[in-house]
Amino acid sequence: HDICDSQLDNEQVSLAGNNEEGFVPGIVPEFYRIGGLYKDPNWNGACVFTPWAYYQYYGDEAVLRHAFPVIERYLAYLDRQTTNGVLENYAQMGEWGEYGEHTPNVLVATCAYYRMLMIAKQICEILKGQKENKLDEKAKLYEAKAKAVRDAFYHHPECYDEATGQFGTGSQASYAIALFSGMAEEHEEQAVKALVEVVKKNGYHLTSGEVGLKQVFTALAEAGYSDVVYQMVMNPTAPSYRVFADTGLTTLPEYWNYDELWLGSMVRSRNHAMMGHVREWMTSFVLGLRPQS
């Protein structure tokens, strides 16, 4: 099904939310802000991630060209939010919806920032025919900035432990987010092995939230471990997608422990698309329908 028109409309709205500081809100138009939950690069960064995903599937350079000025302003804004090169004490949502394991916000946010810088570099290289915008120079600047962020990440105690090779807290998401973003490129083999081990240690149960879930599935599948993803998805005990289906749910809850929250004082959404990453895994890695490069 061709959804390019609707996605393009959504992207236009997102870009229009860019303010004079370069900030892009998580809700556009920004009729209101949800208390302390309005700034996080994995949400606000849709202004970078969405046009890039659109280009990967449709090959439309015009979308990148239109989005790039906003991307530049947003990345400049994020740079001003860093402390010693990382996004510390900035992201408000982090690994939203995580269950049983915690992943540090600084790791989640900084990996997102690093990934955006590398995307910006690639966009510059794709559009570099526009010499008046000095995109060759900008590509080098984004690459240098990404390297600086990477170096800072590896020197932050909540992001990486050089003595043990552990990312973050050693959670599923800690390893997967570092792998997916490219931050763990030099330690890929060890990080993948550690990710598989922590999944097995958790009895093939899902512990990742909204950000890490897609990245856990992707990191495992790209390394040839779709069998591990399958066991997680079909796990007969909670939390798992199979348990959702066996319970009779026809929509996705916001949290893995939706039943506890539903019966308690915090009634949360039971119609939330954010945990739907299993569908992308099935399409991309089971059916094999994904971009070639």
Q: Which residues fall in each region the model found?
A:
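Active-site core of glycosidic bond-cleaving carbohydrate-active enzymes
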Residues: 1-293
